[in-house]
């Protein structure tokens, strides 16, 4: 009998993943990785979650254990706080401090779930690690989830190629309503649990978290086209490319977007919307799960459709889009597809071929 470790989050997707694998005849072991700091014990009253409702919190651990008890499988809480701080939180803060906008969920899959956790599972003699991701797997190929509204391949581009034979994604061929229906039928306590919308390590709003950890200082908002100071920002690390709201412009009639961030000089550059459009990108940290053809589809944000692009070079990685793309943001993921198949991805270093002909704003002087 094949043995599988199911990474349980306390949500319905990983709960149903465990259910399906047990029904398929696997020997299932449930586990949750503890990422959070020491907090007060969770409320044990069913249906009364804490205000901090997210995956991998104490309340979520309680729900995951209830699911394991219902399924009759063992459940373990694994202490991954040190690994998570080193591999996820520290790089996350460093990226923001450098004016980038990171994608911690993609990094977590690469280095924690399909890195450290898989290695531990193999050491314990388990054959597979399974998750509740909406991803399909055919042989060693990863395909978009059947439910287009829930597809999560965007976050799996960094999966180590050598990990692919040991990964299972049981809910990838289902829609979210089907997953909830299976959970209801099996009497799983997570059947109606709301989806987590927050980063698992941010107890509140992201801006407040960054202010607490990075201690940003106010500084000038500079028009990238004229060099004029047009407002004051709250701290360069709090802004991202393409942002329009909350800029603090002196002249409120101006329609301006963030077009660049210079954390060294503590300057945020703003400009017209067209200055946020790019016809290409340069990437770093390329990870390929399949051969990259000369022309690919590339997705630069989770909720935006992919755009056709030509691969100009691999070292450095440079792509040219078939049409301009808004807010090609340093630190975010550029993920490559051929049809429904995930080919790999990279971290965006910078956008190329700016539609407004804008140079790197950090090279500008201002008054």
Curated annotation (Swiss-Prot):
GO molecular function, one term: ATP binding
Signal sequence extent: none
Key words, A-Z: ATP-binding, Cytoplasm, Disulfide bond, Nucleotide-binding, RNA-binding, Transferase, tRNA processing, tRNA-binding
One of the GO BP terms on file: tRNA wobble position uridine thiolation
Subcellular location: Cytoplasm
Ubl conjugation among keywords: no
Protein origin, superkingdom: Bacteria
Gene3D superfamilies per UniProt: Adenine nucleotide alpha hydrolases-like domains (2.30.30.280), HUPs (3.40.50.620), Translation factors (2.40.30.10)
EC number: 2.8.1.13
SS bond list: 108-200
Main location: cytoplasm
Region (Interaction with tRNA): 150-152, 301-302
GO CC field: cytoplasm
Catalytic residue list: 108, 200
Residues the record lists as binding ATP: 7-14, 33, 132
InterPro entries given in the database record: MnmA-like, MnmA-like_C, MnmA-like_central, MnmA-like_central_sf, Rossmann-like_a/b/a_fold
Its job: Catalyzes the 2-thiolation of uridine at the wobble position (U34) of tRNA, leading to the formation of s(2)U34.
Family: Belongs to the MnmA/TRMU family.
NCBIfam families xrefs: PRK00143.1, trmU
Name of this chain's protein: tRNA-specific 2-thiouridylase MnmA
């Amino acid at each position: 009998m094949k043995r599988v470790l199911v990474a349980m989050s306390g949500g319905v997707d990983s709960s149903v993943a465990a259910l399906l694998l047990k029904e398929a005849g696997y020997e299932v072991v449930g586990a949750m990785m503890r990422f959070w700091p020491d907090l007060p014990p969770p409320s044990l009253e069913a249906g009364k979650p804490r205000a901090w409702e997210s995956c991998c919190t104490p309340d979520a651990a309680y729900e995951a254990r209830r699911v394991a008890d219902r399924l009759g499988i063992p459940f373990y809480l694994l202490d991954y706080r040190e690994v998570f701080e080193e591999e996820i939180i520290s790089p996350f803060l460093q990226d923001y401090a450098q004016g980038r906008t990171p994608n911690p969920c993609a990094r977590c899959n690469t280095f924690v779930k399909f890195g450290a956790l898989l290695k531990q599972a193999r050491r314990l003699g388990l054959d597979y690690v399974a998750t509740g991701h909406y991803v399909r797997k055919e042989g060693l190929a990863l395909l978009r989830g059947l439910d287009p509204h829930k597809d999560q391949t965007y976050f799996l581009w960094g999966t180590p190629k050598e990990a692919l034979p040991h990964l299972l994604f049981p809910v990838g061929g289902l829609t979210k309503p089907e997953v909830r229906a299976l959970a209801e039928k099996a009497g799983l306590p997570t059947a109606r649990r709301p989806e987590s919308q927050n980063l698992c390590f941010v107890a509140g709003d992201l801006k407040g978290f960054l202010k607490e950890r990075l201690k940003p200082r106010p500084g000038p908002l500079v028009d990238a086209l004229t060099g004029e100071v047009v407002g004051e920002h709250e701290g360069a690390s709090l802004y991202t490319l393409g942002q329009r709201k909350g800029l603090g412009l002196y002249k409120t009639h101006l329609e301006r977007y963030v077009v660049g961030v210079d954390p060294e000089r503590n300057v945020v550059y703003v400009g017209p919307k067209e200055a946020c459009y790019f016809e290409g990108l340069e990437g770093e940290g390329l990870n390929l799960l399949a051969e990259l053809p000369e022309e690919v589809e590339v997705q630069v944000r989770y909720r935006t459709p992919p755009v056709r692009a030509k691969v100009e070079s691999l070292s450095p990685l440079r792509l040219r889009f078939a049409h301009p793309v808004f807010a090609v943001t340093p630190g975010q993921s550029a993920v490559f597809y051929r049809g429904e198949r995930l080919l790999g991805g990279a971290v965006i270093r910078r956008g190329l071929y700016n539609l407004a002909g804008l140079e790197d704003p950090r090279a500008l002087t201002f008054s």
